[in-house]
């Protein structure tokens, strides 16, 4: 939360775009909630997505 408040003035448009994309991803995720097979697939995909985002953020920070 504090981090977002700090970089809000800096990259406001970027945050808004990311937020919209996130909501879309969440709606798609909800659709595959019942299936067990897609559940494992979703888990792997989510891990890769978060990992990519984290590495990108880390690289930018330093």
From Swiss-Prot:
Localization: Nucleus; Chromosome
Q: Note the InterPro entries from the entry.
A: Protamine_P1
Record key words, sorted: Chromosome, Developmental protein, Differentiation, DNA condensation, DNA-binding, Nucleosome core, Nucleus, Spermatogenesis
Please list which residues make up the signal peptide: none
- Please give the superkingdom of this protein's source: Eukaryota
Q: What does this protein do?
A: Protamines substitute for histones in the chromatin of sperm during the haploid phase of spermatogenesis. They compact sperm DNA into a highly condensed, stable and inactive complex.
Q: Mind telling me what this protein is named? A: Sperm protamine P1
Gene name, Swiss-Prot/TrEMBL? PRM1
């Amino acid at each position: 939360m504090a981090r977002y408040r700090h970089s809000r003035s800096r990259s406001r448009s970027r945050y808004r775009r990311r937020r919209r994309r996130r909501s879309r991803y969440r709606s798609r995720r909800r659709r595959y909630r019942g299936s067990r097979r897609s559940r494992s697939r979703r888990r792997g995909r989510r891990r890769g997505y978060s990992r990519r985002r984290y590495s990108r953020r880390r690289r930018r920070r330093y």
